[in-house]
Amino acid sequence: MIVTYNWLKEFVDFDLSPQELSDLLTMLGLEVEGVRHVGGGLDEVVVAVVEERSQHPNADKLSLCRVNNGKETLAIVCGAQNFKAGDKVALAQIGAVLPGDFKIKRSKIRGEESCGMLCSEKELGLAAESEGIIILPTDLPLGVPVFDALGLKDTIFEIGLTPNRADCLSVVGIAREIAAKLGTTVKYARPSVKESVVPISERAQVIVEDSDLCPRYTARYIAGCSIGPSPAWLVRRLEAVGMRSINNVVDVTNYVLMEYGHPLHAFDADLLAGGKIVVRRAAAGERFTTLDGQERVLTESDLTIRDGEKGVALAGIMGGENSEIRQETSNILLESAYFNPSAIRRTSKRLGLHTESSHRFERGADVDILVTALDRAASLIAELAGGRVATGTIDVYPRPLPRRTVRFRVDQCNRLLGIQLTADEMAAIFNRLEFKVNVVEPELFDIDVPSCRVDIEREIDLVEEVARLNGYNNIPVTMPKARVFSDRPTRHQRLEKQLRNVMVGQGFSEVITFSFMAPGILDKLLLAHDDPRRSVVRLRNPLVEEQSVMRTTLLPGLLDVAARNINYRMLTLRLFELRRVYLPAEGQELPREPLHLAGIMTGVRYREGWNQERHQVDFYDVKGVIEHILDEFAIGSVVFVQDRLDPYFHPGKACSILCGNELLGSFGELHPDIHDNFGIDQSVYYLDLDFEKLAMVSSDNVAIKPPSRFPDTFRDIAMLIKDETPASTIVECISGLRIREVECAEIFDHYKGSHVPEGFKSIAVRIRYRSHERTLVDNEVTPLHQRIVDTLVKKLAVTIR
């Protein structure tokens, strides 16, 4: 936002220097990013009169001039052609330094002496471009600095506004901030419109078909205008804020835009079919040519302004070529409307068309200032273009927008800011900001927010206003205060930490992957079409299709991480993730979010070394990880079975984990097709445990059994057992006898081959016996051992070898 010092002083009285004003604005949160002084240091550029002009003897395009500055007559060589004898001009005398650090010196030009320079607006920094030198009003006194004589000395501030401060996109808005800080009032211009006897209802009609996108539309009709150049004061003021002059009518709309911050648009009323304005959405594929000469293809989401036959403007963004103000324009329909910010933002972004108008509408305009801005523009057009304003204003406002009221607590504000202001002091701040304070209780307010402050929505926004107006530099330095909670972690939290420690202790690294996945990735996992994990939760606004649904398994994320690392030649990996998955819940809108532990192992078992053989990890490595977890959680009576397995496991190389009737999880080698689907060319082993079920069956009380100080003894049993019988059932059968003297039973040999019948396998079990009371002797161990043998033969139909 660009604003000038003098323009601000028209709306608020202050005695601050430009530098002091710059500091004040910055402390208010309106950061001044640049300051430019106009006319400063140009006192040597004075008003002079051309007494004589003649042709340069040595150059066709140069003139010899005799110029009087009120003290003396000087010889000047000039190349401009737009002046004559008797004109008053801006004379840069010897020693003057013009913008761009251009110093005026006595010189000879084509053999003729020149004691100064006649200046153009561009050379004085008054315009970006100019033709010829500046011709001054005839009533200006000679010898007076030009900028003093014209009242052009000014300071231009370039202010960087945050997107929420739409109220400061105007001179009035910034003046309101200055007045609030200084405790003074804004001198609002109350436009007075001299109306003709012709009612506007006889000249124009407005129909709003979509009041959601255009809640309010106002208009005035001005007849008999003469289109021409704007007066110098208006041109210079627009140029000071970075706008170029077009004609007196368009310049007025731009002037009011910068003054009040509300966009206006002027239509050539004679080009509006039927004298009608219709506000409605565009038709899909509709083509419309805007003022910049570009043809735009519109959609049904774009709001247009139409007459009785065609589109004449892209609402809130840019007018149309077919209704613009021309040199021949006589009658004008002036628009002042409020458009839905989201609709303007969407259309502007889609078309790549950003204008001063759309910049303000998409941030939120002031719906209450429409008529004020409209009347201000109408009175200026009548003054500068000689128009006659029709009686009355069209104001279509079927459903007034609701007012915002925000509850405010004085003690909460003091606590958050670390200050000690009274309720009266805070109320005074809000009153200076033109907020209405309704006192509910001595330290409880209901604040009515002005329509211009679209950024005020919650109590914390009001707290910020107190901080700004009271001064950030007035907030005392205090140590931060926070409540310290000493609650102990819950059982689940302790178990989560324990599980992470177990995994890290076994050489795993924790990874964190996205909670989103691509729906098509479930096909890569070979899941059946009726698998519940295909019932995914879809995101309403995904960034990309690859992250458009919530994950129902942790496996894809781990495989993506593994594939990426393997591509970088990190061939040995142990990774785990303890995170939630999102599974459908029958009869409920929201999914279940169980916590799962998933891990993968691939590569070699041990790091390479001269004393280590290079063995690849296998099924028993991942099984060992599972057993270690079960031991840490004190979970007994676990059975490993080769059923209830997911299709992404390799057949015959995976197990499910059962504890009673609860399925705790599964583990094993992944199917070769899974490797191919994820671009992995080595075996990967996977484990998946349901943390909630682990926690449910785990025990917090672990029985401590002191070691026996007596020696053990062992006996071996070699037996034949059917192939389909898991070897683990032998150990389970022995444990089920609950013989106190049996310390452990371990399988130490597994054999299939010669001397073993087809359909059988040879298993050898070593049973260790030990007593805590004495050393066991053979006649005590033998009957115990025989009991075990008999039970195995009877229950498992084994053949003792």
Curated annotation (Swiss-Prot):
EC number, as in UniProt: 6.1.1.20
Note on cofactor: Binds 2 magnesium ions per tetramer.
Gene Ontology biological process: phenylalanyl-tRNA aminoacylation
Ranges for domain B5: 401-477
Keywords per UniProt: Aminoacyl-tRNA synthetase, ATP-binding, Cytoplasm, Ligase, Magnesium, Metal-binding, Nucleotide-binding, Protein biosynthesis, RNA-binding, tRNA-binding
Required cofactor(s): Mg(2+)
A GO MF term: magnesium ion binding
Record-annotated FDX-ACB domain positions: 708-801
Annotated compartments: Cytoplasm
GO cellular component, one term: phenylalanine-tRNA ligase complex
Main location, first listed in the record: cytoplasm
Protein name: Phenylalanine--tRNA ligase beta subunit
Gene name in the database record: pheT
